[in-house]
Amino acid sequence: IFNYAMRYYNLQDNPCRKAGAIGKSKGEPKDFWMQEEFNAFLETVSDKPETRMAFLLLYWTGMRIGELLALTYNDINLEEKTISINKSYQRLKGKDMITQPKTPKSIRVITMPDFLAEEFREYCSHLYGIMKKERLFRFTKSHMEHCMATGIERSGVKRIRLHDLRHSHASMLVDMGVAPLEIAERLGHEKVETT
């Protein structure tokens, strides 16, 4: 239409040409585990309560690894069954760093399923001497990646990345019929398209 208007009605420019092409969607298939695969993997870390709890939280809440590793007891409300995400952990140049979350939308409150809140309550009951502002999980992302690689090998489930546990959680929510906007908010995404 704009080309026609340029040719026959003296329109100076075609605004669509200035805008440029939208481009192709970069949405490539994401790797994820179904619940049966996750459960098979989880069996391989059942002898490590701290690691097991960390993987349970990643899978059932969809939080980022840095968000998990920054959690303190103050961030947990076992009565309300919620986790407040308000910071992130990184290890930079051999030093532990607590930083702001990835984006403003990353600051959020995540609900836990009843069984997870109960498991977390049991886990926390065995934490002696931990201060309310200390990190609940005192290991690093590389420790989690190592445990995951070992667990994958031992369980025989398909290989995915640590971050793909977020995709696993999102996929589970889609299967449950949760609206895309709710999933995006739960995962702390700025845009629904990211989800």
Q: Model segments located where?
A:
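N-terminal core-binding DNA-recognition domain of tyrosine site-specific recombinases/integrases
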Residues: 3-15, 27, 49, 138-142, ...
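Short, contiguous acidic/charged loop-to-helix segments that flank catalytic cores in large enzymes
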Residues: 29, 45-46, 97-107, 134-140, ...
